[in-house]
């Protein structure tokens, strides 16, 4: 089979992993699209995206239009005569004229098993909801938000130790493999799109810092899911002793207890156990303001008085 001439569109590191897989394949990446350089770091200097940096290191032309709605940008893309456009976490909307420009259209790598978790935060929402598996979907793009026909799906189990950070790494390996398999299938004319069932679809909303505040009136299992979903960002937290305390790692005990939600059942070298609406949450790695995340055993060496049995972590109790 003749190698495909590919336009790649993406911006963050997750996308760069997919671009690298294409560069290592027999296919030809003829151009790269990435979002305009953004101010980053303390000096707020303009910074190129990981995708742009990778493309430039391989002498691939990079295009950074602020929008693909402009006629000039659309005409420029058409002159590239691509067979297909691969889109991974690009961040710009593709109008219909762009979707129709490459011979095989535009395909997208999405970090969930569609139609579940369409939208911006599929990896995090799978953890947040307590899903037992996630995966990658390669889909033919249309004008909707992750609504296109599914070309290929892969899955992997979500383990108890998984966080958004670890799932991100796993999908950053699985995604490029699925992408190459889908490209080979499309190139051979053997891959047929499967329409999504709208009745099975739901939406993965972006995370917010406010959402990461731990609510002791939820179940311990739900809080455990949130802590894993919000690691590495925005990181679950609670307000206590006029401080914002972040929780990086926890486990939970589903057994009922008689303690009030938010009160400390016990604190030892293994964890700080806090009562919730259902069961108890065992805090294992936490972070005090302007400090590094530490195991609870190290925190208790200097702050045992904060976490004595019977104290309440509810904001009004510590003010």
Curated annotation (Swiss-Prot):
Enzyme class at the top of the EC tree: transferase
GO cellular component, one term: cytosol
Keywords of this entry: Protein biosynthesis, Transferase
CDD domains on file: FMT_core_Met-tRNA-FMT_N, Met_tRNA_FMT_C
Cross-referenced Pfam families: Formyl_trans_C, Formyl_trans_N
Molecular function terms from GO: methionyl-tRNA formyltransferase activity
Binding site for (6S)-5,6,7,8-tetrahydrofolate: 112-115
Key word NAD present: no
Reaction(s) catalysed (UniProt annotation): L-methionyl-tRNA(fMet) + (6R)-10-formyltetrahydrofolate = N-formyl-L-methionyl-tRNA(fMet) + (6S)-5,6,7,8-tetrahydrofolate + H(+)
Entry EC no(s): 2.1.2.9
Positions of transmembrane segments: none
Free-text function comment from the UniProt entry: Attaches a formyl group to the free amino group of methionyl-tRNA(fMet). The formyl group appears to play a dual role in the initiator identity of N-formylmethionyl-tRNA by promoting its recognition by IF2 and preventing the misappropriation of this tRNA by the elongation apparatus.
HAMAP family, alphabetized: Formyl_trans
Protein family: Belongs to the Fmt family.
Record-given protein name: Methionyl-tRNA formyltransferase
Organism: Shewanella denitrificans (strain OS217 / ATCC BAA-1090 / DSM 15013)
